[in-house]
């Protein structure tokens, strides 16, 4: 069964158990999925309201993008665990001969690279989600303004959590060019996303 098909209670219980997965990456994805879901909810509460008619087209676009990102971030909950499982599987590979050990080392490097790409992709989606959320600020139902603030907070937590998962996987990668590339790109996403989340939060504080 996929993690996304578990109830909230079941997910929390397996997350809090001694099972090797899910872990922080899946939790970060869930946080981000919750964030963009709140943005989508605010759009639902705005569309069709006469008071916000002038923003109807813009909010409809935000709604569509939120729905797409919601689906992607929900999928990331399981993708992160699947990436972790690839790394775990390497430990079950034979290590009796030198050939075995070489194959094991190569497999581990490939698995760690894939495990890096998963949370990095999540970071890309989260930055897009924050940019989408910002478009709704000041143009959506004011009764749900606080929900946009909570959306930004959840997205920021997801972004920072995904970054930590990028870093921990990069720490085992020997390919220096790969490490430098993903560290540089990841730091850029982190800086832009955190700044945007803080900006949204401060804007919401002015109206609640």
Language-model features: where?
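A structural signal for well-ordered alpha-helices, especially hydrophobic packing surfaces
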Residues: 42, 70-77, 84, 116-123, ...
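A structural-propensity feature for long, helix-poor, extended segments
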Residues: 51-89, 189
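Phosphate-handling active-site elements
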Residues: 38-58
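Conserved phosphate/anionic-ligand binding catalytic regions in large, soluble enzymes, centered on
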Residues: 17-40, 144-162
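Amphipathic alpha-helical interface segments
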Residues: 80, 84-153
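Preference for long, well-ordered alpha-helical segments
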Residues: 129, 144-203
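Polytopic transmembrane helical bundles with strong interfacial aromatic enrichment
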Residues: 3-6, 121, 168-169
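Short, hydrophobic/aliphatic alpha-helical segments
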Residues: 3-21
